[in-house]
């Protein structure tokens, strides 16, 4: 199924709306292009609804959050919901500040997300307020290991059931789960913690099923 959907993305090259982190905006645009889609980075409230209308998916990333883009995220997210577009949330740094935590929770209340992608501390913060985010990184105490993997998978599935979204928790071991099943990916490498933004690239390509 994935191979067919990926081929369809390359064939139809859908436009993807990104309201994203300025730190990695160029990398995210290039990732969308590498997947065969086409990126547009638009975060002014005056145009985000128009831009979302002509796109096939929306990626919201709160990494460089400010009061102006909060409004834009809400407008674009609600418009995407009306249009039936998939919407991805990357709650970067949720738990590190009250603004980030409050904004991520408000987005969850007001926008229906198809996928929620974060590190374990960010996702724990959204689920229960119990995450211990270290800036924009997961705290060592939260990290997913082979020893706590079963409980982490159960947590991801429970949060997916609660939000009706696919939950992707990234780290040394990635977990991708819906309410019924989960997949674990062991492709992490210690060097990934030495550069910024590798996790953000996962969320940029988010087109709807182009078989429609």
Name each model-derived stretch.
Residues 189-204:
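Short glycine/threonine-rich catalytic loop with a Thr-x-Gly-x-Asp
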Residues 100-182:
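Conserved phosphate/ATP/ADP-binding segment of small-molecule kinases
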Residues 207-212:
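Single conserved hydrophobic/aromatic residue that forms the stacking wall/gate
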């Amino acid at each position: 199924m994935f191979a067919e959907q990926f081929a369809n993305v390359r064939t139809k090259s859908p436009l993807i709306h990104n309201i994203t982190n300025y730190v990695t905006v160029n990398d995210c645009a290039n990732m969308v292009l590498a997947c065969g889609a086409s990126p547009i980075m638009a975060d002014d409230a005056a145009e985000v609804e128009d831009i979302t209308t002509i796109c096939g998916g929306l990626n919201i990333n709160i990494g460089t959050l400010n009061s102006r883009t909060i409004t834009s995220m809400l407008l674009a997210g609600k418009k995407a919901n009306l249009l039936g577009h998939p919407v991805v949330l990357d709650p970067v740094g949720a738990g590190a500040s009250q603004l980030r935590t409050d904004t991520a929770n408000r987005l969850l209340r007001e926008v229906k997300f198809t996928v929620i992608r974060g590190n374990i501390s960010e996702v724990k913060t959204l689920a229960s307020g119990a995450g211990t985010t270290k800036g924009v990184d997961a705290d060592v105490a939260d990290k997913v290991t082979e020893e706590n993997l079963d409980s982490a998978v159960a947590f991801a599935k429970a949060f997916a059931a609660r939000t009706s979204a696919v939950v992707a928790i990234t780290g040394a071991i990635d977990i991708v789960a819906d309410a019924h099943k989960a997949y674990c990916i062991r492709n992490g490498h210690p060097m990934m913690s030495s550069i910024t933004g590798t996790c953000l690239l996962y969320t940029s390509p988010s087109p709807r099923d182009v078989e429609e």
